Amino acid sequence: MTTGKRLSIAPCPPGVALRLQEEAGIGRVLADALTRRGWSDPADVDAFLTMEGSLHDPLLLGDAAVAIPLLQDAISRRTPIAVHGDYDADGVCATALLCEGLAALGAEVRPFIPSRFEEGYGLAVETVERLHADGVRLIVTVDCGITAIAAAERAAELGVGLIITDHHRHGEALPPCPIVAPAVRGTYPFDSLCGAGTAYKLLEGLVAACDANPTILDGVIDLVAIATIADLVPLVDENRALARRGLKRIGEGKRLGLEVLLRIAKVDARVIDAGAIGFRVGPRLNAAGRLEHADAALRLLMTTDPREAHELAELLDGLNRRRRAIEDRILREALAQYEQLPPVRQDQLGVVLAADGWHPGVVGIVASRVVERVRRPTVLVAIDGDTGSGSGRSLDAFDLHAGLAACAGLLERWGGHRAAAGVTVRTENIDAFARTFAEHATTMLTGVDLRPVE
């Protein structure tokens, strides 16, 4: 294992820090810290501290200018709309906020979140057919869908409208429908929104187009803050502004289910911060989709019934305790498996570990902990019969998405980000996948100092 840490101190040119101190009107300690982080323009520093200019025009976000009139038409015609989300905290928050926002605008809307263990990740052809049979005539995805080409084609065949909102990386081809995503069209000035942040920007544009009361946006900004922090997107630019506003809203105690969950998690809403969301709230919301079905988390966020809120918050708290126990067991087994690898495999700079009996909803968090120990990009695969469901985590120096692309011929499905991704692989291909991934990672990381930076 790679051990030890390296100390990296960014330079602080005294002239730059002094200029920031004087022209931005800030203290020397803050000026030094900002200089070390690359800030040099007093005007930029002032905008960063006041967050002026951090909120961007939603019409620049992918195909938002096309999607918004489609939504307006669906609302006016009372077209049945389904918001198709994902089972993590970001996806659940995005589903809740868009359902609440559309309902406030008069839409006939229902949520749909797939099961991790049945439908799996993303918009599936079967889901499109099921929603069509249930009367849905417009599907809006949140936090997923950017690679769902077959599902988009099936929606078109059935006459079901489709709008995709997503923040994940896409392949060479895109689904044939309006796509609202920071990575699409290249016109949006900020590329690191989470799924809920992306859905919020679409709602922001829709509220303006409908000339509706902007308090609709205030009512869901708390969900954007939770998702932004829980999904670990950078807290800069628009993310920072949205998270700050959302944390303030949480402190006002406006969402019943969240208020109850905070009490159970022993978090004081009046002084809530990103740490409390990341370590107390996010894991409890994620636990539902990891171990059972994310509907419990969604219902908690949307309920107005005190009894239901208490029951659901207790359920999520119990699931989170179960998740921790399962996680600890898998971590022990994964590290033992790594230690049993031949020395030549341990020397390679990419790791794939797999086993029967591992919980597919937990392997992602365990992969993060393995990365902390071995300092290599790691994919953990939970085997179930002839297929395995895996999740990977990476280091700053390695693009996991590109690493999986190098193994695409061995994978059934894959997708995600530079730092985190998911895979489906046939059991018979796991060994070949492990070799190919390790070889690619070794090629890309040879000579790179993999010790964590302090």
Where are these predicted regions, by residue range?
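Catalytic domains of riboflavin
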Residues: K5
